[in-house]
Amino acid sequence: MGRKSNRAKEKKQRRLEERAAMDAVCAKVDAANKLEDPLSAMPVFKKYDRNGLNLQIECKRVTALSPDTVEWAYELTRANMQTLYEQSEWGWKEREKREEMKDERAWYLLARDADSTPLAFSHFRFDVECGDEVLYCYEVQLESKVRRKGLGKFLIQILQLIANSTQMKKVMLTVFKHNHGAYQFFREALQFEIDETSPSMSGCCGEDCSYEILSRRTKYGEVSGHAHGGHCGGCCH
């Protein structure tokens, strides 16, 4: 009876430790979501004036954006991505994409010109993936006239800084394998790696999947390590 009792106590203790660790992870995500402006401590990144561009950068919750701005973001995403979605097993689903982009958890990093016209954006969220607190980048979309000027890389670098400052362990995103330019951009220019949760790594469907999940650890994440065995998916809502 003594050995059984000890095993039960150890099992209970492990559960308590795992729950405490997950509570700490969710507390960080909740704290990040309560920020008014994640860029407030990084004013130097609130403008982009390189390669002929002079843009203002802002970071807001979707609830703080005008309906016109959200509609512009959707239409730009549709124009840039619909064909790529239709070439995948997902297909293009307008209602689902609109709901995703309007979800109250959504944050937007926006680049506007001198007339306040939006020209590029990233939709991201603070969330939990497999026990880790992460910044998940859902979209990074640019109008054609501001592409190939370093702006996309700049926006992703801002996301990495925001992730580190809010103690997220990594920046994650999903990219289609057949979107060769984007795949090369993230893997080579930004040094993202194929995440351990990606189908090709986890063995769930591998080569049959049209996408990879990529990630890059923050400085905070490199120091703090990984919470193995955590639940995959959001836990804080």
Swiss-Prot record:
Q: For binding substrate, which residues are annotated in this chain's numbering?
A: Y85, D127, V128, E129, Y138, T174, Y211
Task: Quote the residue positions with lipidation, kind N-myristoyl glycine.
Answer: G2
Q: Does S-adenosyl-L-methionine appear among the keywords?
A: no
> Per the record, GO CC terms?
cytoplasm; nucleus
Q: Where does this one sit in the cell? A: Cytoplasm; Nucleus
Catalytic reaction annotation: N-terminal L-seryl-[histone H4] + acetyl-CoA = N-terminal N(alpha)-acetyl-L-seryl-[histone H4] + CoA + H(+); N-terminal L-seryl-[histone H2A] + acetyl-CoA = N-terminal N(alpha)-acetyl-L-seryl-[histone H2A] + CoA + H(+)
Where is acetyl-CoA annotated to bind? V140, Q141, L142, R148, K149, G150, L151, G152, K153, N179
Q: Which Gene3D superfamilies match?
A: 3.40.630.30
Q: N-acetyltransferase domain spans which residues?
A: 63-216
List residue numbers at the site (Essential for catalytic activity).
Answer: E139
EC number assigned by the record: 2.3.1.257
Q: Which domain of life is it from?
A: Eukaryota
Q: What is its main location?
A: cytoplasm
Q: Which UniProt keywords apply?
A: Acyltransferase, Cytoplasm, Lipoprotein, Myristate, Nucleus, Transferase
Q: Which GO terms describe its molecular function?
A: histone H2A acetyltransferase activity; histone H4 acetyltransferase activity; protein N-terminal-serine acetyltransferase activity
Q: What does this protein do?
A: N-alpha-acetyltransferase that specifically mediates the acetylation of the N-terminal residues of histones H4 and H2A. In contrast to other N-alpha-acetyltransferase, has a very specific selectivity for histones H4 and H2A N-terminus and specifically recognizes the 'Ser-Gly-Arg-Gly sequence'.
Q: Which family does it belong to?
A: Belongs to the acetyltransferase family. NAA40 subfamily.
PANTHER family membership? N-ALPHA-ACETYLTRANSFERASE 40
Can you name this protein? N-alpha-acetyltransferase 40
Q: In which organism is this protein found?
A: Danio rerio
Question: What taxonomic lineage is listed for the species of origin?
Answer: Eukaryota, Metazoa, Chordata, Craniata, Vertebrata
Name the encoding gene, please. naa40
